[in-house]
Amino acid sequence: MSHGRMNLALSLVFILCGLFNSIFCEKQQHSQKHMNLVLLKKISALSQKMEAHPKDFAQELFKALIIEDPRKNIIFSPMAMTTTLATLSLGIKSTMRTHHPEDLKLEPKLLDVHKYLQPLVHVGRELVKQKVLKHQHILFINRKMMVNQMLLQQISKLQGMDIQMIDFTDIEKAKKTISHHVAEKTHTKITNLITDLNPETILCLVNHIFFKGILKRAFQPKLTQKEVFFVNDQTKVQVDMMRKTERMLYSRSEELHATMVKMPCKGNVSLTLMLPDAGQFDTDLKKMTAKRAKLQKISDFRLVRLILPKLKISFKINFKHLLPKIDPKHILTATAISQAITSKAPLPNLEALHQAEIELSEHALTVDTAIHTDNLLKVPVKAKEVPAVVKVPMKAKEVPAVVKVPMNTKEVPVVVKVPMNTKEVPVVVKVNRPFLLFVEDEKTQRDLFVGKVLNPQVE
């Protein structure tokens, strides 16, 4: 068996542009203050709840998505959504000039929302240190607005945010300015970002993250072949099935009717595949969090022959339509805003879409995520080749063997320790029916991505 190295490129780019119709005439300043207050309270309340119970949020979101699109593939980033909403609430707060912090029912000294971001900020900083993550917040604010400069300085310091004042009334100039600034900050990885813009925009938040990971060993291209994937009892499709054999975390439960494998990546990140038994997929979705936790508890390192389909799927989430189905009490809706505003005034418009795409092949797993008003950005990112050392747990009687893998002259040889016990029979995990996938940060056990693959042939 050859021991190649698999480049796992998880390129994550998520962008949010919050577009709000604002009122600037003297008679309506009081109404605008109340609208911003409602926006801040509701968005920050939701982001705090998402941060406090991340896996519960992911499961609730899954349930809502399944109800809305039961026969579709799903991929999304719970962490991206949490960070986006929390950061957006900071931007809204910066546009409020009040001499009574107690009116906000938030910590008057600093940013109450910020403490809920700390675990995510810490995750980001650690991955940046390991050179597998790059990220930045860019906040564009209408220069005609009166803003809280002290608060903006705090946001810039704590979040490392780049703050730009801009004139949104000249739409074409504003679009070019934003797109050019973002392209410059991302080294032209993101170009022509803004295609549509409202002249009454007060805030435009851009949050971009590029994440790269490396799996220890690649699938073997020469072993890929066509096989049947059972979408359901009535539907089956022919797909390219990849293969590789290696030691990985494995768990199997007859009681839970599910199998799970977990593969480590560089940067304390892992890729987990959860395969429900035939006929148990819908049940597993309803109890996803509990079953996953139980399977992890009983997992151990085993020699596994993994057979997995090549796939490319994408999915779009509309914040405005979906989030009220998860928690109507804390979601920003037109009804909720109108009830909180005493005087008649146009309602602020909040549009945000979350669209993600995932592609899995023999040599790379690429995840692109974009949060934007109306467009999906596809940013191909090549992962740097990093020498890998694969340590495989062995039995007492096994003798380690050193396998030298041919590489470029400038690269350091890869040392792979493999078991020499030829009598060991690998456990076969054949993913030929709907399954779940998770890309997780190991230190915090936070999900960077969550996905449901129903049909690998359908994008």
UniProtKB/Swiss-Prot annotation:
Record-given protein name: Uterine milk protein
Glycosylation sites noted in the Swiss-Prot or TrEMBL record: 268
Lineage: Eukaryota, Metazoa, Chordata, Craniata, Vertebrata
Keyword Glycoprotein attached: yes
Gene Ontology MF, one: serine-type endopeptidase inhibitor activity
Entry-linked SMART domains: SERPIN
N-terminal signal peptide: 1-25
Site (Reactive bond): 420-421
